[in-house]
């Protein structure tokens, strides 16, 4: 999500990156009880830990919404009141089996062939209770038509087909949106029936419109008119945030986002997000990560040893959006050595060192030998970024890294430097290399932001907000003086196993 947001800013698009935490529900209440603390204190500590972790990852989200925030509760109450007044909610009794782990009612379709419950559901109990329901079933055909008419709405395509398969093969039942407060106290009480609290997913999904509503987004606030009043007022152009361009989610929660959420928005009178992009899970050495078996990756430990940009690089380079990714320590170390240290880092270091050694760090006149390669790399990079094909964007960058390193081997500037008659040739080689390094630094902005700034600083530029317009060949002026070359990705000749 951070790379996509940075990428959109890089392309010059107005961008607002929202993330946060859903904190209500039975699992949280039980975890807090086991910990001997209030649910709020428990959530406060986890939220602080998460935000600290986000900072270590170099994330630049514009806002962070917690479902325990009062601003969020106000929006949830407004939505519930509106749907209640419209007749979209009703109360009825229900007897069924309930997964405590997943906080959802189950049906016989969720059983194993032998009639038992799959381990994914955890503890399953039989409940007989009254709850409030949202009239979701009446929207089934509308949602099928919408997804079929808009192929890009759910991506990748096979996730879209999964959603359509579900909608076409099963009758969409009305959604239970409450839990009795006598059983679950940790939730947002229904404003019109305080004996119930809001179902965690109905509450959590609403967080997408919490910040737009609070900032005065006219679309959201017009839909909730009479039910919600933003403190900041309506009409500030900076508040025009809805509909969202993209929701980036995990594959395990696609049903909530591609089925429940669109229907909720339709009932509210709100437009839908333009795209729901579902990514896979990380495996470790080909197996599901598990704390109990020790088969996990500690991101902080990786960042401490290898640097945040090395971690960001491998995560994006190795995980295509859609299928599961497979983390291996050997794979991480191999990519670090070959692509970061020996590829990118070596190119930057030797290009600048040669310019310092042979021309006192002064950029010679423009030369264009590598311009076609750089122009193609930029075009491929931009196309991939627009399509959210982040792996392909990195491939485009490293195509220029490889070509520039090849150019050094072909032109042999260290040999040219020995012959005064070849000074013009050496000048051309040096310009091509240093300008390629500058363009690479610009393109790295969304992916390796810290390294991008470091490279630009070594090139003698104090630049932190690079955009696609900076990636034009020839923007490096003759006579410019570069800074001091420093190792970007120190080689680790004996990586730890």
Where are these regions (language model features)?
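N-terminal, positively charged nucleic-acid-binding surface of large information/translation enzymes
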Residues: 1-155
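A glycine-rich phosphate-binding loop feature that marks nucleotide/adenosyl-phosphate handling sites
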Residues: 24, 96-102, 280-282, 331-332, ...
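Hydrophobic packing residues in well-ordered alpha-helices of helical domains and bundles
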Residues: 43, 76, 337, 367, ...
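N-terminal alpha-helical segment
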Residues: 24, 295, 373-378, 436
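Basic, alpha-helical terminal appendages of large translation-related enzymes
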Residues: 16, 37, 92-97, 111, ...
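Active-site-proximal binding-pocket segments
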Residues: 254, 318, 322, 331, ...
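Structured secondary-structure scaffolds
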Residues: 1-19, 71-78, 119-357, 393-397
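Structural signal for well-ordered, non-membrane alpha-helices
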Residues: 51-54, 80, 84, 345, ...
